[in-house]
Each structure stands twice: as structure tokens, then as C-alpha cells.
From Swiss-Prot:
GO molecular function, one term: ATP binding
Main location: cytoplasm
Gene name as annotated: ttcA
Keyword 4Fe-4S part of the UniProt annotation: yes
Enzyme class: transferase
Locus of motif PP-loop motif: 35-40
Protein name: tRNA-cytidine(32) 2-sulfurtransferase
Record-listed E.C. numbers: 2.8.1.-
Keyword Iron-sulfur applies: yes
Gene source species: Coxiella burnetii (strain Dugway 5J108-111)
Catalytic activity: cytidine(32) in tRNA + S-sulfanyl-L-cysteinyl-[cysteine desulfurase] + AH2 + ATP = 2-thiocytidine(32) in tRNA + L-cysteinyl-[cysteine desulfurase] + A + AMP + diphosphate + H(+)
Subcellular location: Cytoplasm
Amino acid sequence: MSEKRVEKKLIHYVKKALNDYHMINTGDRVMVCLSGGKDSYTLLSLLNSIRIEGNYKFDIFAFVLDQSQPGWDDSALRGWLDDKKIPYEILTRDTYSIVKEKIPAGKTYCSLCSRLRRGIIYRYAEEQGFSKIALGHHRDDLIQTLLMSVFYNGQIRSMPPKLLSDNKRHVLIRPLAYCQERDIIKYAMEQQFPLIPCNLCGSQKNLMRQRVKRLISDLAKENPKVPSNMLRALSNIKPSQLMDHELWNFRELNVD
């Protein structure tokens, strides 16, 4: 697939997500969380292209959180943002030391790291008056999270494309919800984004997400529709076919 075709495909799916879930309103100030990885770079680049087109009237701002991880170097990232003329701020908060101190060796850091990062993001967005917080999760993240929740937490849940935070003060959006990771990888390579590796997560083996990712990949080899069917399932819930006592009073569920 050519460079333009990949970009066109991704923009199509981002616009579809924006429209399907009413993610961005006219005049919104959208804070895009830029981690330095392929997904967040792709999100920021595509939203910037859509903004420049002019059919969607909104402003974007790149928020970068330097968590003081070993080897962090944001000089190329700064250069890329300056070149694109995208306003940004890089905020330094040493969450790395906290995670290393609190989590035993060999255990996954993702949960605590995510909580600390989320608190900082929410606080910054509120202080600066941003109306939307955009995250770079894509289709594969959504379906992997669904299986992880089922297998390891006993819950049917995932990452919604649009979410009101628990404190009711923030709206999170995931414009890449329909985008496949393989297309994002191609796009990131073509754009030559100056990626910053996550040395905290990347050093850990056998993470649950990687195991689930392999499982979905194996199933897709037998039936290529498996990933798209899983995504469709997230918007095709049949509560009457489940076992949740909060949805149904089974004692009183009888013929009149």
C-alpha cells in the first residue's frame, strides 16, 4: 500500500470515529497526549492534517510527559513539533522512581505507571482549560483489552472511544479506535517519526497484553474476521444473554 493510501485510509477511519462518537465539537481545545511512540505520533499527525483541512474547527495542543525514565531524549521530538508548528509543553515529573520503588522486581509496572500518568494528565488539562483529552489507543488495543479483562479480571469491558472521567470533569477521546496497528506501523515508518522508546515497559517479558495479542493473531490466521468481529462485539451487546444480576432480577424474571 502506497504512502498516500495508508494516510488516506487512516484519516478515513479517524473521521469515521470522530463522527460516530461525536468526539470533537466546534471550538474544542484538544490536548493530544504525545508519549513519543508510534501511536500518539500518528494520532497527532492525523488530527493536525484534519484540522488543517478546515472541515473540523478545533485547536490541538501536544502534551508530553517526561517521566524521568533512563535514556529519555526529547530533542528530536521537540524539533518535529517545532517543524509542524504544533504548540506543546513538555512537563517533567519523576514517576519512574516512584514506580521502581513501589513495584517489586519482575512485576509489571503498567498499572501504577498508568495511574500516576493519568493523574498528571487530568490535572494539567483542567489547569489549562482543555475541553478534550485525546489518547492514541487503536483498534488492536481495544480488542486486546477486552480479552484481558475477560481472562484476568472476570469483566466484560474495554476502552470506549469516548469517555467521561470518573470525576466528571474530563472527556477522553480515542480517534484511532477504528485504525489497525499494522497501518499505524506503516504510516509511522513512512513519516519517520522520531520515536522515543519506553525503557520501563520495554524491558519486561511476558506481559499479559503480548500474550493476548499473540492469541488474537493466531485466531486471525484461521479466520481473518476475528479482530473486526471482536471490535463489532463491543458495540453489539446483548444484555439479556448475559448473567449480570445488576441488569436482571432473575428471581422475578417470570412469565406474567
